Amino acid sequence: MAYGSITQRGEAFRVCFDYGKDGSGKRVRQYQTFATKKEATRALNAHKVKMDQGTCVLPSEYTFAQWLDYWYKDIILPQIEETTAYGYRGMIKNYLKPELGEIRLQKLTARDIQRYYTWLMDEKGLSPNTVIKHHNLLTNALNAAESQEYITKNPMSAVSPPKKRQHEAKFYTPEQLGVLLDKVAGTRLELPVYICAYLGLRRGELCGLRWSDVDLEHQTVTIENTRTQAGKKEIEKGTKTVSSTRTLYLPDTLCEMLKTAKEREQECKTAYKNVYDDNDYVVVMEDGKPFRPNYLSELFSKFLTDNDLPKIVLHELRHTFASLSNQAGIPSFNIEKALGHSTPATTQKIYTHLLDRTHTQAVEGVAAIADEARRKA
């Protein structure tokens, strides 16, 4: 039995998966388009093996859980970042499968999904913004089911997601920042807190910062790598966007602190000898091992609690940088440059190997406020 065929359409290849006849004698076929003949052939061969083994499921028999497994592994996983994949796995395993998984794919309705959103918010306590992430996943998964003709009508066309709530960023006042900088002095959080407060870095940029990115002689630091976390796995990659890759000016206070940290690192290398983890990262523990991003956030949160300081997350030191820049009268364009935001103005002209001094005023303005607040603390 043939079980299907491959037809070239332009530069793409369309596979017809033949499932034989259903109970009413009607022949059941499914179609899917692939970019290369190799991919199309591999998919058709896999279909043939399942048909021969008797493990192939008719499209009409697919449960939503089975579709999610196929969509995640074969369609979306090759297209997304590891951190996104980790989030999708969690949503599918912990929420979608338990609540909707047993429903036949072709029987899944807009009402089922709308009730699912209510369940997430009322029973599971998820925020509307988090539920919107579930909505986006469902839209992607069911659009794929529709395009591959597993469903004839997409229920997502009649589903209304919850209204997105605008997140109001929290940040420290100059006085609060001064107290934080005073209390963090001499602790293992001193360097990471100063870097985030004085430069406005993202957590991933902070954790991905290497000494090879730091030029103490010319007082610059180049932001071009990140280190993030998906579950227990740490992921090293480039910056978030093209405009996130940037070279920043190092104010005197931070430059001196980095020089001290470099000297301290040499002392630790001598003390720990062969067990020292010499990896070139700037933000490390005494034995040279880099801080895991989530652990660094946990340490920061605990430090604030232990010292009766207002609760913010580590990323909100970046918001503090933006707020203090604005308070210092720095033009918004220069603040965006320092933060590495993607805007039409900055994406047109990105300098990664030369220092763009348009942002220097922002960095120096925040440094002046922070230094003054620290002295008063």
Model-derived regions, located:
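N-terminal core-binding DNA-recognition domain of tyrosine site-specific recombinases/integrases
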Residues: 19, 30, 60-61, 72-155, ...
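A short, basic/aromatic helix-end/turn motif that makes direct DNA contacts
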Residues: 33, 208-214, 336-342, 352
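Short, basic (Lys/Arg/His-rich) helix/loop patches that form interaction surfaces
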Residues: 124, 128, 182, 186-189, ...
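Short N-terminal "domain-start" leader segments
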Residues: 1-11
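Catalytic-site neighborhood detector that most strongly recognizes the C-terminal catalytic loop/helix
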Residues: 163, 171, 227, 339-365
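Basic, Lys/Arg- and aromatic-enriched nucleic-acid-binding interface segment
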Residues: 128, 132-134, 147, 151-153, ...
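N-terminal DNA-binding module of tyrosine recombinases/phage integrases
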Residues: 9-111, 261-278, 371, 377
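C-terminal secondary-structure termini that scaffold catalytic or DNA-interacting sites
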Residues: 182, 218, 231-260, 264-267, ...
